[in-house]
Amino acid sequence: MELFKFEPLLKQTIWGGSKIVTFKHLQSDLDNVGESWEISGVPGDESVVANGEWKGKTLNEVLAEMKDKLVGADNYQRFGNRFPLLIKFIDARQDLSIQVHPDDEIAHKQGKPMGKTEMWYVMDSDEGASLKVGLKKKITPEEYARMVDDDTICDALGNYQVKSGDCFFIPAGRIHAICSGSFIAEIQQTSDVTYRIYDYKRKDKDGNFRQLHTKEAAEAIDYTVLDDYRTDYTPVKNEATLLVSCPLFTTAVYDLTEPMTLDYSELDSFVILIAVKGEGSILTSSGDTYTFREGESVLLPATTDIVKVEGNIKFLETFV
């Protein structure tokens, strides 16, 4: 059995910082790197395999040949040749825009192929860093439009001081924003549909205001108010700790100080492992050993049965 590693796919943004290049141990002088697309099947931004017999092939080319052997029978029937998840690292040197993503139904009505549900795992944060998630008070669509116009929409949003290990589930329709000083891993549907609600009246490098999608967002927003949007969980060493389980993905975190065997023989899905701290190795049932250290994301095909992870390493595990 072979696991897949991928070439870096870095995105420079007006709000990006310098953490990603260091975190991924890259030799690069790029600045303002806001995102690393770790595993992507988004057309035009497809990950390229960096190892083994598939080296140089895109993820979508591998999927077209391997089909259900890569993603699992149910997933292949459900998603076809569209890889279902997009994995990112995000480094916010400045605040990102206030935004929302549509669900699949609304996305289809607005001419988009798929909506977007996602989750955030905070890998690191500067002192005072925060995330904006969800509505903290009830507002109507009319009040929403007024608050965007008079620059008070942030007053309606939950604001969370964050630290390493914090987790937030962001289903389609939930308003959110990543704020300066946050360094996160993002797991999401394979979609790049974002409706920008508010951007602090900032201008791009050409002196233009960035496009807003206030009207489209109004239709997509879920106006439900929750008491707390932070995921409540208690991490346990050397065990799987569930973070999120929804129809689109299931994610757990592992914090290992001793070897652990992961049995996927009954799972009809690919598995992605995302190293967020430390280093170790992955041993497959066929006897192959792969290095695995922070900043790396690896894809295990659905044919994987058992792997052993060794080392002092914290990583996320996600599958569909």
Locations of regions flagged by a protein language model:
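Short, basic/aromatic beta-hairpin or loop at an interaction surface
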Residues: 138-150, 268-279
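Ligand-binding loop in jelly-roll beta-barrel domains
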Residues: 80-82, 90-95, 104, 125-128, ...
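His/acidic/aromatic-lined binding-pocket segments of jelly-roll/cupin-type domains
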Residues: 87-88, 96, 118-121, 159-160, ...
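Loop-centered beta-sheet repeat module
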Residues: 147-195
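C-terminal amphipathic alpha-helical segment
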Residues: 195-267
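Short beta-strand segments in beta-sandwich/barrel cores
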Residues: 261-262, 278-283, 297
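Transition-metal
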Residues: 1-139, 199-227, 251
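Short acidic-glycine-tyrosine-enriched beta hairpin
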Residues: 157-169, 284-304
